Amino acid sequence: MLDGAKEIIPGAIGYYKDNTISWLDKQLTRYEKRPVIILQHFPLLPPKELNSHKVYQPEKYFEVLNKHKNVIAIVSGHYHLNGEKMQNGIYHISTPALLKPPYSYKIIDIVTTKEFSPMIYTELRPVDVK
């Protein structure tokens, strides 16, 4: 689980510190033969273009991702919006929030076989607030 350093940059912008990126690099090397899913607060590929919410200086993070081929997905929130994008073989999944309408959550299924790369399926489900 990664979270951007809010104490460095105030506001809604996220920032992944160098020691966090270094830790991620070591973990991805350690588990290089396994498919990895990263859970984090700030998305690298936002579901909506809002300059006020972007990750500050994501280049080092992308360098680490490009170096390792075992990351299959990154799941994040922050925008409170549903969205999915694919970049360089990594599925970037943004999840909605439960605190405001439309109240919903996301189910993520990952299917793996020895013959094929992992396949990821997502389903957005409404929350019954009655």
Regions from the language model: what does each represent?
Residues I8, L45-P46, P101, V129:
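Flexible, glycine-rich phosphate/dinucleotide-binding loops
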Residues D3-G4, I13-Y16, N51, Y105-D109:
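Surface-exposed beta-strand edges and their flanking turn/coil or helix-capping segments
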Residues M1-K6, I37-L39, Y91-P96, E123-L124:
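Active-site-proximal beta-strand elements of phosphoester/diester hydrolases
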Residues I9-Y91:
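His/acidic metal-ligating clusters that form di-metal
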Residues N82-K130:
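Binuclear metal-dependent phosphoesterase catalytic core
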